[in-house]
Amino acid sequence: IWVHFGSGNIFRGFIAQLQQRLLNMGLSDKGIIAVDTFDFDIIDKIYTAFDNLTLNVTLNADATVDCEVMAAVAEALKADAHQPNQIARLKQIFAAPGLQLISFTITEKGYALHRPDGSLIPAAAADMEKGPSGCVHAMGIVAELLYHRYKTCAAPLAVVSMDNCSHNGEKLLSSIREVVNAWLEKRLVGKDFLDYLTESGKVSFPWSMIDKITPRPSEAVQKRLEEMGITGMEPIITSKHTYIAPFVNAEKPQYLVIEDNFPNGRPPLEKAGVYFGSREVVNKSEAMKVTT
């Protein structure tokens, strides 16, 4: 029911925790499928190597720590055009009418199709030239998967940016639409696909506000875990220069406000502490965050 793009610390330390709470409360029996479009070492060395489990270390104000094993990730996949089996599995998932939402923590630059001078990023340009097959840019990959969903079942779906940038849903929609319009101009897809994404009411791009600090893995936390008898927690540096560990350390405060626009339903995430409301509520929450 839920696919998340961006397998880094904000996902592991916050988003996956939300689904874990629902699992703990018996309000869901489903996990999240984690997908990475950029740093595939994370999937191999942090997810697969640890059976998709993460140790979440919460740093409390009184200097104590709370440790919890997160087991909400049911599957971890690489959106890698050079690994056809991974793409085939993703397309199988996107063809399922029961998929309710796909979400993102890929950073604001993950949505960018253009360089600062306005020219297209080469990966984005290549995707827009060749159409919905073998895409490599995150936005091309998602557009390709959405096209597969449209062709197979055309079921509703919420496409939810959870990245820390204002009007994030608008940014995500704009990038997807630009890719699809390029395909449409070359007659690689029909206008019916664009209408499905933007006019049918079947696909939504809700806005959200997120507030959570997940710093890089702390050596002090790792040492503390070792003193508790928890070993094998050494951080790694991936080939894409991500510094990441089998554990996530973060302070306790966290907020997520999402525009409640889910045409295929959604998990009861309000029970896990997520706030839902109108787009106006999201905007006001964003203003509150940046001005207080």
Q: Residues of each region from the PLM?
A:
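Substrate/ligand-engaging "lid" and interaction regions
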Residues: 1-292
